[in-house]
């Protein structure tokens, strides 16, 4: 179960890390391409050399993720369970859902982590390992953010 004790302090650093990860992944093919979205995710890459500008664009990134929630869910549907698309999109989609569940929402109670159990049950056959890996990655980021939060 995730530790939400330092979630508020971790939020800022996690945003920075998530933005940095997205910028680093640009050009590798490991990113989401929204056909009907506003394109805000791509805006982050325009200011990769300026931390202030990156942080200013995090809001756009969050807005895009929120408004495209149905599309994110579609990414882990049967439509993407084959071939290259599965490898390209599934882990990223799982991470975005975890981001929505554990970071974007203001969760006060650790029992809210049960939502992850529902998600895992729904996609158990294919995505359990992917979601576990994404959850572990998010836990590690929160732990690192907690350790560094006093510097900010």
Task: Walk through the language-model features, giving the residues of each.
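Glycine/proline-rich, positively charged
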Residues: 94-96
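N-terminal interaction/assembly modules
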Residues: 1-86, 105-120, 128-152
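Ser/Thr/Pro-rich, acidic low-complexity intrinsically disordered regulatory segments
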Residues: 89-92
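Short amphipathic helical patch at the helix-1/turn junction of helix-turn-helix
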Residues: 99-105
């Amino acid at each position: 179960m995730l530790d939400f004790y330092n979630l508020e302090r971790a939020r800022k650093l996690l945003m920075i890390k998530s933005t940095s990860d997205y910028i680093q992944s640009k050009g590798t093919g490991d990113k989401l391409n929204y056909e009907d979205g506003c394109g805000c995710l791509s805006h982050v890459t325009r200011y990769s050399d300026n931390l202030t500008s990156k942080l200013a664009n995090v809001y756009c990134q969050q807005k895009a993720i929120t408004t495209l929630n149905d599309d994110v869910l579609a990414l882990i549907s049967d439509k993407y369970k084959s071939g290259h698309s599965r490898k390209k999109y599934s882990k990223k989609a799982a991470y975005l859902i975890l981001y929505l569940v554990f970071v974007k929402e203001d969760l006060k109670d650790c029992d809210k982590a049960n939502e992850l159990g529902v998600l895992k049950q729904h996609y158990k056959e294919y995505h359990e390992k992917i979601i576990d890996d994404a959850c572990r990655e998010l836990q590690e980021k929160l732990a690192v953010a907690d350790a560094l939060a006093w510097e900010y």
